[in-house]
Amino acid sequence: MSLPERPGGISSEHRNAYRQSQSRRHRPADIEASSYYPVEGGRSSRHQPGLSANSFAETIPSPNNSFVENMPLSPTGERPAAPDQPFQRKRSLIRPERNRIDKDHPNYHYRKHAANMSTMPSATGNDPIAEDIEATTDVSGSRSQTLDGVSDTSPPRGHGSRPNSGEQEKKAPRSSAKRVSRHKSGKITKSTKKRSTPQEVIRPPSFWNVYCAIITFWCPDFMLKCFGMRSRAEQRAWREKMGLISLILLIMGCVGFITFGFTAVVCGSPPLRMRVNKVSDGYMIFHGTAYDLTRSGHPPAEGIPVPRGQRGANILWGMPGVDNRGKDGSFLFQNVNGRCKGLIEAAPNSEVPTNANGDLAWYFPCTTFNQDGKSEPNFTTPYYTGYSCHTSEKSRNAFYIDLKKSADVYFTWDDIKNSSRNLIVYSGNVLDLDLLHWFDSRQVTIPQRFEELRDTNTAANKAFRGRDVTRPFQSNGDKEIAECFEEIIKVGSIDTVTVGCIASRVVLYVFLALILSVVGSRFVLALIFQWFISRNYAAAKTSQSSDKRKRNQQIEDWSNDIYQAPARITGDIGSSVVTSDRSSKRGSTFMTTSRFSTVYGPDRGSSNKRVPTTMASSGGSGSQLLHPNSMYRQGNDSRSSFLRSDPYASNVPPSDGPGPAGFIHEAVVPQPPADWMPYGFPLAHTICLVTAYSEGAMGIRTTFDSIATTDYPNSHKVIIAICDGIIKGHGEEMATPDYVLAMMKDQTMAPEDVQPFSYVAVASGSKRHNMAKVYCGFYDYGAKSAIPVDKQQRVPMMLVVKCGTPDEATKSKPGNRGKRDSQIILMSFLQKIMFDERMTELEYEMFNGLWKVTGISPDFYECVLMVDADTKVFPDSLTHMLSAMVKDPEIMGLCGETKIANKRDSWVSAIQVFEYFISHHLAKSFESVFGGVTCLPGCFCMYRIKAPKGAQNYWVPILANPDVVEHYSENVVDTLHKKNLLLLGEDRYLSTLMLRTFPKRKQVFVPQAVCKTTVPDTFMVLLSQRRRWINSTIHNLMELVLVRDLCGTFCFSMQFIVFVELMGTLVLPAAIAFTFYVVIMSIVSKPVQVIPLILLALILGLPAVLIVITAHSWSYLVWMMIYLFSLPVWNFVLPVYAFWKFDDFSWGDTRKTAGETTKKAGLEYEGEFDSSKITMKRWAEFERERRSKANYWGSKENVVGGGNSWSMPPGHQYHDDYYSDA
C-alpha cells in the first residue's frame, strides 16, 4: 500500500487525479464520483501529503523529491539526491498484492487511491512494469461514464526531457480533445442528463426484506396509506421497524426463557420432599413416601370405635392405645408376592395364609415403627392373626388407589453413612437392612443371603453398609435380592438431582459467571485505567493546578453554571508556562539564563529521550514550516529569524501582487521553533471545529471564549466555525451566522465583499449542490467580554456559512444540510489537501483563508477538535488531549469528560448527572483499556487527521482517509439501518467508521480533558434526544459487532464486549421488568432467591464503590440515589419509546428554530443534481487561473519570492515578545 509522504521524505509514486468510488458508482452525475483524465501532454499529480511547501507539485519544485519537473510557475528545477534508506514495509505472511480487496474491505477506497497513481519511469532507463489499470481500479465498470463538461481538465503542460516521453504522448487518454473545461461547457443538455440518469437495476429481494414482509403481511400498503404513510420509503421504514421490534421481542423472550422458563422446562416442578427424621406429626410414612392423614378416618373395626359425629377414627391419633403420628406404617400395607416370590416362603406350621400358588398374605408383623430406625421387632399379635395387615381388596384399593401421596422422604449421604443405621442405596432407593430382623422365623423362611446382609458383623454387611450397592449387586447376582428389597424394606430415596436440574444449574451458573466476569472486569479495568493508564496521556504541566483533588474541585465548581468562568484563566502562553517553571520552589541559586538565552526556554534537543514526531518536527531542523524556495516564504527561513530585530529588512520594495504571500495577515501569530515544548511534548497543530445550527449569542460566545482561552499556544490552533445554514434560533433576534460573524475582527476581506462558493453537499437531488461563504480573521472577545483584556489572546478564526444556492434563498433554512455535511466539508478538504486532489471552489478559498490568518499550510494540521456550539471547554483540556495524541501515535481519536452545567434545573436534568458520570468513568474507562471507545461524543472529541508511519518521513491519513470520508459522506440513505446511522447518530457513526477502518488503532478516553454543556431539562426534549441516541447506538453496535479485527479474541475481546452491550441495550425493558419481579417475589415468597439479589446488588452498587475509590466528589452518591430511583425511566420508558420510533428520523424537540413546531427529517429532496454548476480543479490549476486573471506573470523574483519581493511590509513585526516572559 502506498503511503503519503511526510515533508522532507521521498515520493516514489504518482497518481492520476481522479476518484472512482464503488459506493457512488450508481451516481454517474456526481461530480466527485466522475473520473478525471488529464489532456494529452498533461502530467498526473503526485501522491503528496498535502499542499504544503513540499507538496505543491504543480507549482513549486521540491528539492526532496526524486523526480522534479519544470513547472509553468517555477522557472527553476532542482534534482537533489533522494534519501539513502527507502521506506520498508513490515513483514507479513500474506503478500499485500494477494489480498482480496472488495468494496467491504476497510481500506477499499484508500487502495483505489494508491492503485490509481501512475509510476514515473525509472532514472536507470528500465521500463516500468505496466499493469492493467482497467482491471485493478475500475471496480464499478463505469469508467467511461464521465460526462463531457463534467470532468475538468488541466491545460497542456510543457515537460523537460525524460525517458519514454514519446511513448507517453502516444498513450494519451482517448477523446481528450473532446473534453473541455467546465466553465466552457455550459449547462448539461437533455441528452446528457438522459445518459447520466442511473438505470434502475432489478435485484432480488434480500432476506431481511422478505422477513419484514412476512412479519407485516397482515398490513398491506393501502392500510398504511390510510395512516398517513403514502410514500414507499415510509412504508418500507415501517415494515423494517416492525421486523426489528419482532427480533427484539424474540431476544427478550429468549432472555426471559433462560431466566425463568428453562429451569421449569428441563427440571420441572419437583415434588414436595421431606428429610427423614423431620417428617412432621401430620404425616405417616409408607414405603418411603409421606402421606397427609390429618383428615383421615378409619372405618369401624375391632378395637377401632367410630367417634360420634365422625365417619371414622383418625389414623394418626384416634386409634386406641396407638400413636401413629410421624411413624412408618409400611408393614400395614406390605408389597407381597411380587419380586420376592420364591425368595420368601412360608415356614412349616406357619399361620400366614397361603394359596395353591404359594402366595403369602404378609411377610412382617403388621405394626408400625419409628422413622429413625430405633424400633425393636415386635412379634405380638393383638386380637387375631393378621390384625392390621389390610389384606382385603377394599382396604388395599383405599390405600393404593384412593390415597394421594404428599411428599417423598429423602436421605442425605450423611444420613446413609450414619453408623447407628444399617442403610444401603440401590438405584436411588434407600433400603434399611435392619428391617430384615423383623422376619418371624416361625412364620416365614428367608435366604441365607438375607441373614448375611442384615448382620452387622459379617463381611458382606461391612462391605455394603452406607454405600451405593447398585453396581455390585447387579454384577454379582444379587440383583434379584435387591429388587426384592425395594418392595419390602424401602424407607426413602437418596437426595439426588435430575439431569435436567443439573443442566439448568449449569446454565444458571455459566450465565452468572459470565455476567459477574463482565461486571467485575469492567469495574477492575476501569479502576486500572483511572489509576495507572490515564496519567500517561495527560500533560506533565498546564496552566491549572497540578494537585488532583484541588483541580477536581475546581472543575466541579466550574461546571455548576454554564456561563461560569474557570478559577484561573490562562493568559499568554509564554508567561503562563515559563513563569510557572521559574517560580518552582526548588529554584537554583545560580543564574540559569542570560541575555543571550532563547525566549523559548532551555534547549530540548539535547535530551537523549526520543521525542514524538509531529509535522513541525519532521522536517529535520524542527523550525522550518515553509520550504526555502516556497512562494509562501516570508524572508524568515531559519530559526534565527524569529529573534532578529528587523526580520523583513530588504532592499527590494514590497510587492502588492496577488500571490498568497501578499495576503498574509499582518497580525498572524508567529510560529515558534519545533523544539519548543512548554508542556513536555512537541506541539502539534490542531483545528478547533465548532459546528453551529441555531444557537444563541450567549452560548456561542462562551464556547468561543473557552476555546480561545485554552492554554495551548495560539500558533498551533485555529478556530473553524461552520454554520449549518441561515438559521434563526427560537427566541433569537439574529440568525446564528450573524452572531458568529459579529465575533470576528481584523478580517482579511470585508464581510460584504465575501462571495459564496459552490461545493458538493451531503444530500440528494438538487440539494446536493450547495454554496457557502468563507470569512477569515481573528476572534473578537467583544467590548463587554468577561475575559480580562490582558488575558485576551489573538486566535485565528475562519467562519464557513452555508448560505445555499440562489434558488433556495427564499425558502426556510437556506443552506441547511445537517451537521454531517458540516463535518464532511472539513474532512473532504483535509483529504484533498493530503492527496493533492481536485477540490471545489469552496475548498480552495478555505485553503487560502487558512493560509492568510495562520501563515502556514493547512496540511500541517494533525488533529481536529470537534466541539458543539453549546459546549464550554476547560482551559487545559486541549493541552491534555493533544498530549495524548502526540505521545501515542496509535491513538486516532479520543474524548474528554462532559459535565452537566444545569444539574439542578429540574428532575429531568438531575437524573442525568450520574448517568453521564458512569458513562465516562466506568464504560469509557473500561473501553479505553482495549483502545476501543465505541462512542466519541460529537460535542467534545478529537480525531487525528494523519499519523506518522515508520521512520522515513511518511504519513498515513486517518480522519482524511478516503474510506472514512467516502463512507461518512454517503448520500444514498435508503434503508432503516442507514438512516439511523447517518441521520440520527452521525457522531457515533464516525467513531464506528474509524474503528472499522483502523481496528488496530486506538480510541481512548482522557479524563483530564473536561467540558461542560447543558442537557435537556424537560421530559419531552429528553425523550426526543434519547430516542435518537438509543436507536443510533443499536445500529452502530450492529456495525461494530461485525468487525473481527478488534482487540482480543473470543470472550476476551472487544468484539464480545460490543456484542454484550448490544444485547444489553436491546433487552433493557425486559431486564428492568425481571428485576422488579425478582425483588417482589423475594419479598412475598419463600425461599428467597439469593443469587439474583446478589447480582443486582453488585451491578447497582459497584458504581458507588467507584465513586469512593476514585475520590470523586461525594455529591455523586446523592446523584446516584436519584439515578437509581429513575431506573424505570432509563431502562423501560426511554427504550420502549425509542424502539417504537425506529422509523422516526427527525430531531424532534431537541433544538427548534424560529417559527418551527417540530424538526423534520428532511430526507426527501426534489430535483436533479446539476454537476455543471460546481467547478473542481487541483489547487495548482486554481492558482494558475487566479494569477492569469490578475495578469501577474512576472519575473523569476515574483514567482519564487526572490529578493523577498513578497515579504510583508517593513513595519510588520513577528511579535517576538509573544513567547517571552514579559
UniProtKB/Swiss-Prot annotation:
Name the residues that span the membrane.
Answer: 204-224, 242-262, 509-529, 1056-1076, 1090-1110, 1116-1136
Q: What happens when the gene is disrupted?
A: Significantly impairs conidiation. Impairs penetration in host plants and exhibits a significant reduced pathogenicity in Arabidopsis and cotton plants.
Keywords (A to Z) from UniProt: Cell membrane, Glycoprotein, Glycosyltransferase, Membrane, Transferase, Transmembrane, Transmembrane helix, Virulence
Example GO CC term: the record gives:
prospore membrane
Reaction catalyzed = [(1->4)-N-acetyl-beta-D-glucosaminyl](n) + UDP-N-acetyl-alpha-D-glucosamine = [(1->4)-N-acetyl-beta-D-glucosaminyl](n+1) + UDP + H(+)
Q: Where is the composition biased (Basic residues)?
A: 176-196
| Glycan-bearing residues | 64, 116, 378, 418, 636, 1031
Q: Which GO terms describe its biological process?
A: ascospore wall assembly; chitin biosynthetic process; protein localization to bud neck
Q: Which InterPro entries match?
A: Chitin_synth (IPR004835), CHS4-like_dom (IPR054295), Cyt_B5-like_heme/steroid-bd (IPR001199), Nucleotide-diphossugar_trans (IPR029044)
Which GO terms of the molecular function aspect are on file?
chitin synthase activity
Compositional bias of kind Basic and acidic residues = 94-107, 1213-1222
- Supply the SMART domains for this chain: Cyt-b5 (SM01117)
The segments labelled Disordered in the record are: 1-108, 136-199, 595-662, 1201-1222
Gene3D superfamilies assigned: Spore Coat Polysaccharide Biosynthesis Protein SpsA, Chain A
The source's domain of life comes to Eukaryota
Q: What is its EC number?
A: 2.4.1.16
Q: What membrane topology does this protein have?
A: Multi-pass membrane protein
Ranges of Polar residues composition bias in the record: 51-68, 137-154, 608-643
Location of this chain's protein in the cell: Cell membrane
Kindly list any coiled-coil regions of this protein: none
Task: Please state which protein family the record places this protein in.
Answer: Belongs to the chitin synthase family. Class IV subfamily.
Described by its record, this protein's role is as follows: Polymerizes chitin, a structural polymer of the cell wall and septum, by transferring the sugar moiety of UDP-GlcNAc to the non-reducing end of the growing chitin polymer. Plays a role in cell wall integrity and is involved in tolerance to hyperosmotic conditions. Required to successfully penetrate the host plants and thus plays a key role in pathogenicity.
Q: What is this protein called?
A: Chitin synthase 4
Q: Which organism is it from?
A: Verticillium dahliae (strain VdLs.17 / ATCC MYA-4575 / FGSC 10137)
